[in-house]
């Protein structure tokens, strides 16, 4: 295994030096050294390493994009993320719930464009739903059985400031991964965590698909190493299938 890891490190480094975009999903810290080397070599501009520890838990901001472009893929991924947080794995959302969440995301993104004082984050999205979107639902007389706002806010409250997972979707690093060419997601410490794993997997897939769609004429590579345990649920396997379609097409 050590020889295979050494060979893979060598190949991955060669691809990176040739200008490829590389996303690695790993357990076992096989690429930490190479990622640190690239981070140092590029003076911090590249080589992004995501891992989870109690002292420094993994954190993202899926609502932030550097160029301000929220394309159809990005909007869809935000809606899917919210549904993943809200619904149990075996619980299918209704059509009206999907429509309500799509509307909430679109209206929130419109507000970001008109009010530059709002910092894109899960917290400001949650506050928007709790106030502006609530008023809109009341005006439209949307029935609770079509979209249960109180249930949605209650289930997602742990991800809002002061909640158990408030760090997860509110990173203040303002990091857009689109232009980062070497990214490692180390999943060892969360591979059994049924709350964190679906969210992190979604962000991994969205990151790579965004590169596939938006970076033309550039080689992209995703390498899923020794972490099948983290990807065996029905939820995760569907994302792998979703990922494979555009990758094969490319």
What is the role of each PLM region?
Residues 1, 29-45, 54-249:
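P-loop NTPase motor domains
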Residues 18, 249-250:
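Helix C-cap/helix->beta junction micro-motif
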Residues 11-14, 212:
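Short, basic/hydrophobic alpha-helical segments
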Residues 1-11:
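Glycine-rich phosphate-binding P-loop
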């Amino acid at each position: 295994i050590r020889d295979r890891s050494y060979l893979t490190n060598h190949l991955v480094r060669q691809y990176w030096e040739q200008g490829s975009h590389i996303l690695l999903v790993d357990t076992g810290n096989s690429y930490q050294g190479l990622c640190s080397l690239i981070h140092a070599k590029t003076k911090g501009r590249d080589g992004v390493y995501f891992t989870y520890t109690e002292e420094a838990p993994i954190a993202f901001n899926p609502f932030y994009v550097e160029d301000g472009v929220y394309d159809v893929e990005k909007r869809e991924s935000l809606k899917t993320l919210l549904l993943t947080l809200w619904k149990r794995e075996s619980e299918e959302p209704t059509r009206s719930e999907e429509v309500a969440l799509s509307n909430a995301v679109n209206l929130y993104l419109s507000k970001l464009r008109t009010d530059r004082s709002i910092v894109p984050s899960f917290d400001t999205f949650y506050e928007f739903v709790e106030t502006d979107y609530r008023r809109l639902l009341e005006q439209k007389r949307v029935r609770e059985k079509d979209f249960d706002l109180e249930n949605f806010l209650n289930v997602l409250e742990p991800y809002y400031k002061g909640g158990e997972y408030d760090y997860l979707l509110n990173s203040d690093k303002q990091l857009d991964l689109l232009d980062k060419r070497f990214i490692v997601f180390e999943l060892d410490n969360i591979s059994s965590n049924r709350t964190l794993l679906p969210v992190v997997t979604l962000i991994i897939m969205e990151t790579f698909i965004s590169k596939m769609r938006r970076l033309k004429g550039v080689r992209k590579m995703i390498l899923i190493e020794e972490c099948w345990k983290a990807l065996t649920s029905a939820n995760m396997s569907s994302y792998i299938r979703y990922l494979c379609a555009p990758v094969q097409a490319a």
